[in-house]
């Protein structure tokens, strides 16, 4: 709902096709290409014809833009559609080009960069490359009145979720997640945010289990004025 509220507040006409399903990433990541293929084709069938397809998940967007090509060979409708698929922050910065948001958020925010958003969609610069620094999610958060940012020691480290990795390598996944939470704790994070629900669900689960004093919100909720 936060994504819908946010986009409509910015004057965007939004349609939500109720026939949509999972993008198929869990199946493809598990090597089940034949199970992922009908979901990919269904996505193309449902979303072809829209001016823009916006998703509040860098992981799902990367699946559609970068990995459907593995399944949909020489598929003209897909090739035409894939250029219209945007991660939410990418859409706000690069397409709508918004410069201000009338939202107050007087909290110290810790921004987690998902691996797919960072390294496959290039929503921000990473520490592995000697390139000009940029961060589209942070650019949006900086528009909010009263916001303060946590200074993390490892700004773009993986949270450890990795989809089915969290099941097949549970101990490693949880250790990586707790490392990220510890970094936010030392930085004084009050609200931990990201653009991927998968990362947030993983980190939020560890925060609840370990009873850590950090609130978790998707970036769409913050930008839409939720508290």
Enumerate the predicted regions with their spans.
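Iron-sulfur cluster-binding electron-transfer modules in prokaryotic oxidoreductases
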Residues: 1-227
